[in-house]
């Protein structure tokens, strides 16, 4: 087998019959599989050992040769080669067909490639292939022209002869009729008898006349058809074709079936065809030009490649290796077999029958029928169900053909090449491990022993506990006590990977140091649950063991959970104390007046703790404590900031008014962090962790998080927070409030009954009334709840729940929606604490069910979106440090605020400007340089820029990056998950796709009706994101001005027209069929600028691209996506969205090909287009003209240069058909293609830059070595290199560790 590391490209092409025979190890002649008695393969059958290799290692069929010493011998008795049985996975056979057949992919695919090549309609092609019509394959026009006069004379003579015989026959019959009539008259027959005889005679004469006329017409038709006979002409009348063949067989050839197609293809002159098509494109218009372009693509593909178009017609069919289509014996003696065996059997049966019929000299009609059946059998083998009804197996199930083996989620690409099951892995239920450190996980002993079995066995032998591997294995299986000690030693410092499905982003797989635990559940650190989105209600996780030293190093350095604290989407910490820990820290830092020990002063924190231990001081009592080693005091958001006493220096002792709890809280924070002297809730904690992440090393951050976790759990236990029925306090004035609003509602109902308002108005009024009522009851509840209430504590601290949920439990359920999503104007007045009535319960179930259904749909949709995003961006990798471009994009850093117009940091600066590279120097008003070009923008720099009064800066962006492949580090900016400059080799495309796809599930599904505009749908949430990335024309699209000008409105009967009168006096632009319901943004007489929206609605990005160009579209799409995510409170950095948009705008449509090889109308990569044009201009040629195109992500994925990647994405057969015809070569640049062929992916340390590192000793080191004495003088000689891979099985590398 070929070693995957020895090639850089993979080409796909059309296999000719010679190729297939070359691959084959023998012809399969019989449809038999295995003998039912001996269970051994039948000779020359589908499992024949002679063709495909032996079933048992080193053993021939008849048993003459057994053992490895006969390796390579071919048995003279049974003809089987003595070799390994695994060759049955790679050796192919073939079936020699008795008649040619066409390949269904090329004939039936859309568009039909055979049809384009031969210029035949698919309908006609089908008639020819399936023996319904004859086709003329060649005409000897010269001979026909030469002999036409003779032939016409012959036909004329025949016609005359026919006319003469007709005349003589009629004359004879007329004479007989006269004689008969005369005889009857003489006999005195009745008039009606005479009439009947006369009519009979005349009818016979008419028939003679008609017969002769038909004969003459047929001769005319034959001559006429012959005169006009052209190659590729169809003759559907069989009798006509036979007569043509019998009379003029030497002037033309023709036939039906695949043989005729083969003859047509052989007779084609591709060069002449291509030239004539190019001429048509130059001169033609409309449909003719479009068809010529499409045909030229196919013709040029065969001209420019080594492909022969004859590959589309098969003379022999390859048979894939038997172990890839196995036959397995089931219990009870029956066999389960792959569907392919049935399909091959059909082909072989029909082929053998056809051979026999041909040998017997059967009539043409029978042979043709058998040929058609053979064609259908081969079609079913290649792509069952593509044409006609699929071939079915038992239970009417369509059989899986070769195409089905590749297609879809269960196909070869997605099931076995992109996702494989791996060894050294296990899975189990997870439980919380509150005692673990951030970088640890608890691994069940039994599981660890199984996973690390080889390591344990080797170590047992090393330590002389076992003599050899075999006895070590026995020791492990019997679980001897010494085994556990060795296991403990082996797993120390050996990280394992934990993964929880679904792995939505890179934090779904992290590395941990395993700690052996009892039981069978994996223990997880509580802080990593957010990243895995794990909880302990029965979730399971998988464990994988990295084996090689490199894999272990990567796991430890890159994937360890303590190094994955920041979220790739926005660079914020994801490892946050949650729930119990927040309650604990809230309790710890809460301040309560009037508690024991309030107002006392302590000389040190130790003294205060002693007072607490003795029961003289309450944790939350305000006291004064003298603290040492402080760098400052943080008083929290909204409070007056702390001012240091005069003369105080950092580190000096200082007395602070605080609580003991806050002192204990600060002990968890790293030294050198300001003293936190305020109540800790979720938001404040998040800000602290954010701050720590920016200012302290990862080690300190991990230790702090562990400290916070410990403190949180400990004090949560101490706080004794519980919920009882008594804690759910109903608002005392609830009844009174509801009665008041009930009267209001009655008043509205009465007005409606009197006809004073419409049903719609009544509904609106009622909803408004009950919304007010609900809010008022909720307010009542807020005031009634005491601060000590545990529910209030949970909500106030941000640990769990919100006021809306509490309102439903304790106060009032409020208004609910029906299944359509409309609000029911009658509220549920009860709370869950009081209990709902039957009707209330019934109407409240609607919303709950819809919620569950929505969530299920959303999850599937979101997963599919992520898959498409990954596919489109998978080859965007950081390829170089800096592409050196001067291009950049302007971005807002600050925004004006208030009346004074002071400049503050822009609200979205964190997700737009942060983590980017400055493109220019930033100068303040006085001309001093505030920030230099190439600086990394962080929050400190942003503050400095805004303080200097600068509102907008130019930054580098992936949208303007000029790297040929992927993007460069400078244009990408800082890596968000690491907080450092991005490394060359980082797979930023996949990170971008994950960052956008992962929060997809949180986005709402619904497209809802806005209150103001009745019936106008606004797409929101996930469907809107899909609409943007698929570049679809949006629902409710708004027209935009093509040119600056004045607006004129014209109202029609049902719709209105907007007319823009351009400023430059050119023709007016009319936008018609605009609904009267749509709100206008430009009124009569207004002046509009180019690209301005004329009505309310969504802009069509394709229009925007046409009018304002790519930059406007990039800004628009980024803003639109961000709008959806921000509405749900999800933060995603712009750069992730920009990477996807860059991929969507990567192609250019060629309008005029100039002197280039590009065909007009084809999509070309922008970089290739520009470099080709530059080359032509430098050589004095005419450059091509093109137009940028916005492609949806699905289309962009399928248009990628890598056919492997596209085929594994969607429409597998179409992609492979196209790639084979164009003999596409995949240069294995992206990640998917390398995963598919089993190479190391070119990202991270797998990128060639890092793979080709050589260690060069310095000159001093060399001199030092050369000056060393005591080395024997030796000359090493090497034999000539073979250039082949060395089989690693033959070498002993000793220890792997």
From Swiss-Prot:
Cofactor details (free text): Binds 1 Mg(2+) ion per subunit. Binds 2 Zn(2+) ions per subunit.
GO CC terms in record: DNA-directed RNA polymerase complex
Superkingdom, natural source: Bacteria
Protein's GO biological process: DNA-templated transcription
InterPro entries found in the cross-reference section: DNA-dir_RpoC_beta_prime, DNA-dir_RpoC_beta_prime_bact, RNA_pol_asu, RNA_pol_N, RNA_pol_Rpb1_1, RNA_pol_Rpb1_3, RNA_pol_Rpb1_3_sf, RNA_pol_Rpb1_4
Signal peptide: none
Binding residues for Zn(2+) 2: 883, 961, 968, 971
Residues binding Zn(2+) 1: 60, 62, 75, 78
Reactions catalysed according to its record: RNA(n) + a ribonucleoside 5'-triphosphate = RNA(n+1) + diphosphate
Keywords: DNA-directed RNA polymerase, Magnesium, Metal-binding, Nucleotidyltransferase, Transcription, Transferase, Zinc
A Pfam match: RNA_pol_Rpb1_2
Cofactor needs: Mg(2+); Zn(2+)
One MF term in the entry's GO annotations: DNA-directed RNA polymerase activity
Coiled-coil zones: none
Annotated EC: 2.7.7.6
Binding-site list for Mg(2+): 535, 537, 539
Entry similarity comment: Belongs to the RNA polymerase beta' chain family.
Assembly mode: The RNAP catalytic core consists of 2 alpha, 1 beta, 1 beta' and 1 omega subunit. When a sigma factor is associated with the core the holoenzyme is formed, which can initiate transcription.
Function: DNA-dependent RNA polymerase catalyzes the transcription of DNA into RNA using the four ribonucleoside triphosphates as substrates.
HAMAP family: RNApol_bact_RpoC
Protein name, entry field: DNA-directed RNA polymerase subunit beta'
Organism encoding this protein: Salinispora arenicola (strain CNS-205)
Gene for this chain: rpoC
